[in-house]
Structures are given as structure tokens and as C-alpha cells.
Curated annotation (Swiss-Prot):
UniProt-listed Pfam families: Homeobox_KN, PBC
Subcellular location, record wording: Nucleus
GO MF term list: DNA-binding transcription factor activity, RNA polymerase II-specific; sequence-specific DNA binding
Annotated organism of origin: Xenopus tropicalis (Western clawed frog)
Name this protein carries in UniProt: Pre-B-cell leukemia transcription factor 1
General remark: The displayed sequence corresponds to the ortholog of the mammalian isoform B sequences. There is currently no X.tropicalis ortholog sequence for isoform A.
Family matches, as CDD domains: homeodomain
Assembly, per entry: Forms a heterodimer with meis1; the interaction is necessary for neural fate induction.
Function: Acts as a transcriptional activator in complex with isoform 2 of meis1, to induce posterior neural and neural crest gene expression, and thereby specify hindbrain and neural crest cell fate. Binds to a highly conserved region in the promoter of the neural crest gene zic3. Required for the nuclear transport or retention of meis1.
Ranges where the record places region PBC-A: 45-124
Polar residues composition-biased segments: 318-331
Start-end of DNA-binding region: 233-295
Signal sequence range: none
Amino acid sequence: MDDQPRLMHSHPGVGMAGHPSLSQHMQDGTGANEGEGGRKQDIGDILQQIMTITDQSLDEAQARKHALNCHRMKPALFNVLCEIKEKTVLSIRGAQEEEPADPQLMRLDNMLLAEGVAGPEKGGGSAAAAAAAAASGGAGADNSAEHSDYRAKLSQIRQIYHTELEKYEQACNEFTTHVMNLLREQSRTRPISPKEIERMVSIIHRKFSSIQMQLKQSTCEAVMILRSRFLDARRKRRNFNKQATEILNEYFYSHLSNPYPSEEAKEELAKKCAITVSQVSNWFGNKRIRYKKNIGKFQEEANIYAAKTAVNATNVSVHGSQANSPSTPSSAGGYPSPCYQSDRRIQ
């Protein structure tokens, strides 16, 4: 018994530290610390690799992708990602709904169709001509040149619209195809369903629809400006026929000292010219302004109408004197003799 303490003191390296279970526990603690440090280092390496992905060349990226697809743990990683995705999708699945069509875009489409700009026919053919004829309210031969100009400019707007629309559709299709190919490629590594690809395509189309709306809006504005310039303005400044212009000018220059016709005179002139009273008033207002601005230019015209008025007055006086002159004696017996009554009055 006395030898045991002596043995323990004679071997200081053996004791509590020499207990096999305690020694194993201490070794496990050291291993755990080393394992935790190793995991931190692995995570740091992964993050560093992620940060340098954008700096990799295409060949390096393809090599990394091939190595990942051939890795023996790839199926396990994909299954874990599917489980995580399923939990996440369940919470947002009900929020995905199709949005209704934009009413503003529908209005623009209807307007472009009505104006003959949109539609299957390109080049401003019969549709544009029909729109021009309908907007003009019926054109005569006098306005054929103006309407031809309108149709030509409408055809130009139509051509620009379809050219820009083709560019828009081409860019949208190219970007959509690129995104779809990218998602299909990524679906080999992370779970992506076909419905999610369709949803992404619809999101892209909504983003591009804003560009389409701007194009259609600017086209509609161009058509409206063209319409007001060549059609509405033409109605306002429509020239009267030659006979109406002659009647109005004759009255104006015959009343040059006071070229302000009364309401009765306006109504009479409107009947003679087959126009409205307001058109007569507008014509006299514009005529007075033009005459005051350039009296010398209109003086010759005033002289012409003054001479014409004098000739007309002379003709009227001549015809009047002939109508009032006594009749010539007839061959039967000349003037009839007056009959005297008893009261000496001539019958």
C-alpha cells in the first residue's frame, strides 16, 4: 500500500493525465477546434471563389461548370436545393396571378387601327387612304393635292411605326430567348420549373411593354398633329367659290367707307353665297385686317370693283330709262286722244 504513492510520485508524467478516457476527451476537444477552424476556412474559400466568379474567363467558367456537374455530390446538392425551394415556393405560390391587359395600351391600339397606321397592311395602302377620306369628310377635285400630301405623310408615319415596332419586337425576342436559355442552363444546377420560366418571360414582356407604349403614344400624337394640320385646319380656312368671293368683294368695296355690314345685310349675303352668317362675319373681319395692312396692294382690286360697280349702275339706269320712256306712235293712229269729261278732267 505504501508503494502506490511512491510509484505515483516517482512517475510525475503518469496520473490524471494518464487516464485513458480523459486523454481521449482532451484529444477530441482539440480535434473539434481544429474541425471548426477547418470549416471556417472552407466557407471562406467558397466565398472567395464566389467573389471571383465575375473575373473568370469563359473557359474557366466552363471548366468549373463541368467539374460541378461531374461531382459525385451533385445529386445530393440538387435534392437539398429542391427541398429548400419547395418550402419557399409554398409561401408565395398564391401571390402569383396574371395581370389584366393595360387599358391605355388597348386604347392606343384601337386608335392606331382606326387611323390606318396599325394592322397587317404595311406601306400606307387602302387603309390609310380610307382613314384620310373619312377624316376629310369627303374631298372634291380642288383638294386632291392636299389629300395626296396627307396620305403620303400618313404613309410615312406608318412606315416609321412599323420599322420601330419590328426593332422593338426583335430586341424583345432576342432578350427573352437569352434569358430562357440562361434559365434552362441554370436548371441543371438549381431547380427551375417550366412555369417559373414562363413567369419570367411575362415579366420581361411587361418591362418591354413600356417601350411599346411610348412608341404607340408618340405615333398617335404624330397622327393627331397631321390630322389637325391637313384636315381640321383645311375646314377652317376653306376657300369660298368664285361667285361667293365676287359677291363679298363687291359689297366690301362698295361700302369701303364703312365696311361693316348690318345683320340684315349679312343674312342677305349668306343666302346669296350659300354660306352661314358667321362665315360672312369672319370673312369681313379678315378682309378688313388684310386691307388695312396693305392698302396699296388692294387699291387696284378696289378700282376694279369700283369700275365694275359703275358699269353695273350704268346698265341698270339705261334699262330703267328704256322701261320708263313713252311708247312710240303706232301705225294705226298714233297716240290715243284724251277724253274730256264735263268737269274738264282728263281721263
